[in-house]
A protein has these predicted regions:
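Interhelical loop and helix-boundary elements at the membrane-water interface
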Residues: 1-19, 69, 75-93, 129-149
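A feature for the membrane-embedded catalytic helix bundles of lipid/isoprenoid biosynthetic enzymes
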Residues: 95-160
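Multi-pass membrane catalytic core of lipid/isoprenoid biosynthesis enzymes
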Residues: 50, 68-121
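Membrane-helix interfacial "entry" motifs
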Residues: 2, 36-44, 113, 135, ...
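Membrane-embedded alpha-helical segments that form the functional core of polytopic membrane enzymes
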Residues: 20-66, 101, 105, 116-129, ...
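Juxtamembrane transmembrane-helix termini
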Residues: 29-36, 70, 111, 134
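Residues in and immediately flanking transmembrane alpha helices
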Residues: 25, 77-80, 155
Length: 160
């Protein structure tokens, strides 16, 4: 039971709920009332939301993986990786989430008959890794990157 709670803390479950609800609210309260022709069915749209949630969760995981040394000093009490979840398991979840997101993202891109859209998902995965590895220490570029990814999660709803 404690491992499940740690896992939900690692992926920041509450934040993921907010991400999903934001996409759902935009779709059903802002886009649907004004558009009649939708490429994605409701179930396919839910897959898009799932893809966003998986990529976001993997971003939280990789961020915590790269922060282990810093968290040992600054956040020893709230550190998850290296205490209740090993680095190896965290990396495994990171890979699984990204692979699932990529497969679903490619599937959705094929549905809308534009496989180039799958590059959006690849960009998001790579961008979150780059942020965690290098950009986090750069105030300007790190914040710009996070802002762009946040905007992209909203833009994707309209794009698909």
């Amino acid at each position: 039971m404690n491992n499940i709670i740690s896992f939900f803390k690692l992926i920041r479950f509450k934040n993921l709920i907010i991400v999903a609800l934001t996409q759902l609210l935009i779709k059903f309260s802002l886009i649907n009332p004004f558009l009649d022709n939708f490429i994605l069915s409701s179930n396919q749209f839910y897959l898009l939301v799932l893809t966003t949630v998986l990529i976001t969760a993997s971003g939280y995981i990789i961020n915590d993986i790269y922060d282990v040394k810093t968290d040992k000093i600054n956040k020893e009490g709230s550190r998850i990786i290296g205490k209740s979840i090993t680095s190896r398991i965290a990396i495994s979840w990171y890979i699984i989430f990204n692979l699932l997101a990529l497969v679903i993202g490619i599937y959705i891109s094929c549905i809308v008959k534009n496989t180039y859209y799958s590059l959006i998902f690849i960009y998001c995965i790579f961008s979150l890794w780059t942020y965690s590895k290098r950009m986090k220490t750069s105030f300007l570029f790190g914040n710009l990157q996070v802002s762009l990814l946040t905007a992209l999660s909203i833009f994707n709803v309209a794009l698909f």
